[in-house]
Amino acid sequence: MAKKPDTASRIADNKKAAYNYFFEERFEAGLVLEGWEVKSLREGKVQITDGYVVIRNGELFVIGLQINPLGTASTHISPDKQRTKKLLMHKEEIKRLIGKVEQKGYTLVPLNLHWKAGKIKCEIALAKGKAEHDKRDTIKDREGKREVERAMKTNHR
């Protein structure tokens, strides 16, 4: 029997990303974190919707990933909740991403944070921004699916 994906290991999802972007490819990257950040992530005190990925000197960094510190976690240091976090990926993957991001219209967006083998990973996507009419189409599709589900639900009663 196939192993089901563990949804409990998800820490945070970027729900706005699917609305604002078309995803070309998805990648998984490790994060360089401090101890207080890991403790806060265990409690789910993170906001990922404003995050984006930049490339500096051949390295990837996540900006705008807001991790709110616990009140008891960091008493001897002053935590910076908007700290820029480095992403860890293989050099070949980074080179491939740099080549694609340099093409017009492509960007890197964090999709979610999750646990994998005791480590916190960030799923990022090579994405292209949606135009306003594409966003409207997404809303129409979502409402259409909702109507169908509602109709099916009333027919089953």
UniProtKB/Swiss-Prot annotation:
GO terms for molecular function: RNA binding. Residues 135-157 are annotated as: Disordered. It is found in: Cytoplasm. One of its GO terms (biological process) is trans-translation. Its main location: cytoplasm. The keyword Cytoplasm applies. Keywords: Cytoplasm, RNA-binding. Belongs to the SmpB family. Required for rescue of stalled ribosomes mediated by trans-translation. Binds to transfer-messenger RNA (tmRNA), required for stable association of tmRNA with ribosomes. tmRNA and SmpB together mimic tRNA shape, replacing the anticodon stem-loop with SmpB. tmRNA is encoded by the ssrA gene; the 2 termini fold to resemble tRNA(Ala) and it encodes a 'tag peptide', a short internal open reading frame. During trans-translation Ala-aminoacylated tmRNA acts like a tRNA, entering the A-site of stalled ribosomes, displacing the stalled mRNA. This is SsrA-binding protein. The lineage of its organism: Bacteria, Pseudomonadati, Pseudomonadota, Betaproteobacteria, Burkholderiales.
